[in-house]
Amino acid sequence: MDLENAQNRIIDFIRDETGRAGVKGVVVGISGGIDSALTATLAVKALGKDRVLGIHMPESSLTPAVDSEDAEALADWLGIEYRTIDISGIISAFMAAVPESESADRLTKGNLKARTRMSLLYFHANRLNRMVIGTGNKTEILLGYYTKYGDGGVDLEPIGGLYKTGVWELSSRLGIPESLITKKPSAGLWAGQTDEADLGISYVKVDEVLKMIEDGVEPEVILDKTGISADQLNSVTRRIERNEHKRKAPPVPELY
């Protein structure tokens, strides 16, 4: 991949889309991970630091302190306006108001947290006449590895054309701190959660697989070239198929 070309195209994309919408800037959720770090960095290059608001939304009992420290350090490095909003009280109030939430499984509860964060981002975007820019990468989008109307509820996905491995490469090129690049990716929706444990395969391998699937490579060849198991390949293809609805607008019946 031509990293310079990718960088320039993403910067132009942010400028063009925000200009077309006539907004004053963007709001981005900063988790302390590499995807949001790269997104915020590119937004600053596109619009300038004064038009980028970073919001960190930890859950006090769950979010590792290092994530909050890394999020704040990134905002300081970029020189952007930055706020921290603890979502614990909001989640607790929801749980108290909806008794059934106590017995909900951890995925349902995790999705609630992602949608709470989306609502906070849009509150500030609406208040300030800005757009919400997402931090999803191509790997996550193809797999449907995100919450519908949560972290998937955004106006723009600037790094949505970059595989996860491409996110690491472009981040390194831009001088984003190595500690963020090498940190284990996690959505932070429950204790001990990591992306690669959820997926059952490393990002390096899953990116190889996704590229081959897009190129129409036969399953037997994918298994031979990547060295992954048939179960891992089936898991990837099932995710793509099962989560197709996330990549489409809600269906509407044809009446005329």
UniProtKB/Swiss-Prot annotation:
Residues at which ATP binds: 29-36, 135, 164, 186
SUPFAM superfamilies associated with the record: Adenine nucleotide alpha hydrolases-like (SSF52402)
Listed GO CC annotations: cytoplasm
Residues that bind Mg(2+): 35, 140
Keywords, ordered alphabetically: ATP-binding, Ligase, Magnesium, Metal-binding, NAD, Nucleotide-binding
Pfam families per the UniProt record, alphabetical: NAD_synthase
Biological process terms in GO annotation: NAD biosynthetic process
Pathway where it operates: Cofactor biosynthesis; NAD(+) biosynthesis; NAD(+) from deamido-NAD(+) (ammonia route): step 1/1
Binding-site list for deamido-NAD(+): 115, 148, 155, 245-246
EC number: 6.3.1.5
Catalytic activity of the protein: deamido-NAD(+) + NH4(+) + ATP = AMP + diphosphate + NAD(+) + H(+)
NCBIfam families found in the cross-reference section: nadE, PRK13980.1
Function of the molecule: Catalyzes the ATP-dependent amidation of deamido-NAD to form NAD. Uses ammonia as a nitrogen source.
Subunit structure of this chain's protein: Homodimer.
Stated family: Belongs to the NAD synthetase family.
Protein known as: NH(3)-dependent NAD(+) synthetase
